[in-house]
């Protein structure tokens, strides 16, 4: 590895004077769906699933409420995201899993992919917390089973 490139933890220590914000969104995480296509006469149009649109609108309201009065972040950003997902019954009903579910330490190793959750959240944050999700230069993302579904977000400016 190139010694000149800062690692995630080193950058955290050096850049601590920049703004950092935290959000806890009490909403069940949803993955971004693929665009849908429809043929209308000789034209093909794209459209978005209604469920993800409604979810994103609700998520934007929650973000706007918690982020009210703050200006949009500028420059490069570092994100730490935790998606807490309701476990399926075959996990939640097993007695030996109860404490692990309470501790929120069981990682989700099933579909949907983590980047689809991330994309849906970043799209909801764009225009409220930051101008564009392209500003996110570093990220630490995890998805875990929890009896309290939610999304926890930490965003930190690492340059401006």
What are the language-model segments listed below?
Residues 2-160:
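Acidic, proline/glycine-enriched N-terminal capping motif
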């Amino acid at each position: 590895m190139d010694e000149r490139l800062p690692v995630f933890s080193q950058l955290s220590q050096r850049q601590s004077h920049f703004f950092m914000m935290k959000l806890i969104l009490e909403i069940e995480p949803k993955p971004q769906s693929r665009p849908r296509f429809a043929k209308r006469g000789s034209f093909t149009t794209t459209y978005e699933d209604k469920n993800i649109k409604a979810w994103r609108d609700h998520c934007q309201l929650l973000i706007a409420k918690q982020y009210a009065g703050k200006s949009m972040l500028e420059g490069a950003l570092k994100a730490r995201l935790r998606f807490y997902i309701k476990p399926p019954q075959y996990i939640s009903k097993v007695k030996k899993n109860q404490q692990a579910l309470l501790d929120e330490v069981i990682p989700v190793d099933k579909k949907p992919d983590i980047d689809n959750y991330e994309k849906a959240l970043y799209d909801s944050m764009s225009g409220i917390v930051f101008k564009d999700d392209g500003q996110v230069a570093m990220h630490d993302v995890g998805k875990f089973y929890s009896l309290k579904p939610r999304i926890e977000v930490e965003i930190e400016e690492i340059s401006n």
